[in-house]
């Protein structure tokens, strides 16, 4: 990407697609269908979210929608229980996936399908790369793991709750600075990814310990000073390697080898002819009504 000094007014937008569509699916309980009986609730809500993005980022220079591939990776090797509790994608969502991908294509969003890496690590790598190049970088996701990346150039946007996580918002919501998010989640645990925390440590205790000692290394060095059952459980979690493993699971990679060129991350104009046909097929009259007369 270009020189830092050239990019300070330009935005890079990275979309965590599976996070968005799962939240769209569960957030819209009205099981919409088209005339063929195909469910469309997640598709409809995802498109509504996509419609907002160009207005949110008027200086969007590059963007990418990243789809998870579902393959095994180093985290599964490190802990076979990682995400093991997750149920298969609901059938009502499975049947919508081809249409969701088609909507992204027709609307002109560049896409990347993760294969041997998690989408989170690809997004983490691109965010770090674009932030270092001086771009204002925005990750569209409700996944709290991304908050570890937040800095003066990287923000996380939770579109479902209309929250922009900059450094101050991370501190407000989690009680710790972004640089301590990995340690915070390792103490607390992350049920969404089946990552173990320390028994008896809740969000307030995790934040208190990290703010008091300043880092996980400092907590390790001073673990004998932590009293009560919490101290006992922390010492046990250090001794059996649980904390170290949890931190490895939570830490996003920012060095994934990617062969993307600038042109691979440029949004294209919507194909209006295809879009009209798509909306008719899906029975999306509200989107058709927004179209200029052709």
PLM regions with names:
Residues 144-145, 204:
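Acidic, divalent-metal-coordinating active-site segment for phosphoryl/phosphodiester hydrolysis
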Residues 2-137, 146-155, 159-164, 244-245, ...:
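Noncatalytic, basic helical substrate-engagement surface that gates or grips nucleic-acid strands
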Residues 16, 141, 161, 200, ...:
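Conserved residues at beta->alpha junctions
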Residues 137-143, 283:
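Conserved RecA-like ASCE P-loop NTPase motor core of nucleic-acid helicases/translocases
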Residues 4-9, 57-61, 153, 164-294:
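Non-catalytic nucleic-acid-binding/docking modules located in mid-to-C-terminal regions
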């Amino acid at each position: 990407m270009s020189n830092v000094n050239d990019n300070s007014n330009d935005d890079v937008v990275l979309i965590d697609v599976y996070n968005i569509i799962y939240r769209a699916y569960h957030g819209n309980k009205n099981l919409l269908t088209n005339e063929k009986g195909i469910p469309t609730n997640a598709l409809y809500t995802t498109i509504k979210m996509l419609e907002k993005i160009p207005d949110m980022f008027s200086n969007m220079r590059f963007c990418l929608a990243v789809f998870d591939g579902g393959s095994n990776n180093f985290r599964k090797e490190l802990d076979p229980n990682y995400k093991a509790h997750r149920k298969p994608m609901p059938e009502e969502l499975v049947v919508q996936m081809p249409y969701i991908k088609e909507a992204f294509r027709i609307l002109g969003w560049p896409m990347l399908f993760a294969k041997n890496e998690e989408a989170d690590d690809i997004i983490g790598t691109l965010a770090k790369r674009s932030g270092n190049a001086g771009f204002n970088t925005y990750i569209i996701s409700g996944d709290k793991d991304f908050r570890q990346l937040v800095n003066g150039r990287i923000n996380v946007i939770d579109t479902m709750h209309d929250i922009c996580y900059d450094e101050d918002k991370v501190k407000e919501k989690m009680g710790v600075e972004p640089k301590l998010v990995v340690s915070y989640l390792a103490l607390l645990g992350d049920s969404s990814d089946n990552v173990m925390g320390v028994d008896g440590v809740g969000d307030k205790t995790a934040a208190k310990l990290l703010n008091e000692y300043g880092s996980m290394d400092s907590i390790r060095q001073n673990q004998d000073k932590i009293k009560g059952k919490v101290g006992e459980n922390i010492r046990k979690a250090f001794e059996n390697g649980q904390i170290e493993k949890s931190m490895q699971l939570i830490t996003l990679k920012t060095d994934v080898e990617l062969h993307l060129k600038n042109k691979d991350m440029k949004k294209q104009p919507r194909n209006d002819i295809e879009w009209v046909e798509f909306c008719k097929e899906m029975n999306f009259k509200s989107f058709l009504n927004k179209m200029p007369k052709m």
